[in-house]
């Protein structure tokens, strides 16, 4: 979670460097990245469509993307439904939709299935796989190994800012290195 905050310029790093897209200036790079770092924050009494309209206006991008985004996240048929009528999985999919406004190349998600019931977890995992098949790079922070195995192609295991292990998921899971996760 801390790493995601740093790479999104929400938190300042106390050491180290990184760059996006071959060293693109940070403000330009940030426009290519969609993110969901916390619990979705929408107006309960507004429709999915109106909530995305507000989000697009605040971000100053993606206003014309609303229909497409709602189709991408499987909520187009419910675009006029109030947010308060959505299941937890639908709320999370709408939040991912908000992160997709403006057509980012990269999507950063912090614990995207946290607090969801099994049906919601399945919905979000399927959405993540679908978005990746569309060419969107997705970076996920998760403490759930099962989630990582089911939706990720590569994994990096960090402890207190230090990289312990990284590589393709299958290779890391077969590794002889023993990692104790607490």
Model-based region annotation:
Residues 8:
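Helix-to-loop junction immediately C-terminal to a conserved catalytic motif
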Residues 166-167:
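ABC ATPase "signature
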Residues 15-29:
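Conserved ABC transporter NBD signature motif
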Residues 53, 57, 63-78:
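Conserved ABC ATPase "signature" region
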Residues 107-111:
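Catalytic Walker B motif of ABC-type/P-loop ATPase nucleotide-binding domains
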């Amino acid at each position: 979670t801390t790493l995601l905050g740093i790479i999104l310029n929400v938190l300042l790093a106390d050491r180290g460097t990184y760059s996006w897209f071959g060293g693109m200036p940070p403000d330009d790079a940030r426009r290519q990245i969609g993110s969901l770092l916390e619990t979705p924050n929408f107006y309960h009494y507004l429709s999915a469509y109106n909530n995305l309209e507000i989000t697009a206006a605040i971000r100053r991008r993606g206003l014309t993307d609303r229909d497409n985004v709602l189709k991408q996240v499987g909520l187009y048929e419910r675009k006029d439904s109030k947010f308060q009528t959505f299941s937890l999985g639908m709320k999370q999919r709408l939040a991912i939709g908000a992160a997709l406004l403006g057509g980012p190349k990269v999507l950063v998600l912090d614990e995207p299935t946290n607090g969801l019931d099994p049906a919601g977890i399945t919905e979000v995992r399927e959405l993540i796989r679908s978005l990746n098949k569309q060419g969107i790079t997705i970076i996920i922070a998760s403490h759930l190994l099962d989630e990582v195995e089911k939706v990720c192609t590569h994994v990096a295991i960090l402890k207190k800012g230090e990289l312990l292990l990284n590589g393709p998921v299958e290779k890391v899971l077969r590794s002889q290195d023993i990692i104790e996760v607490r």
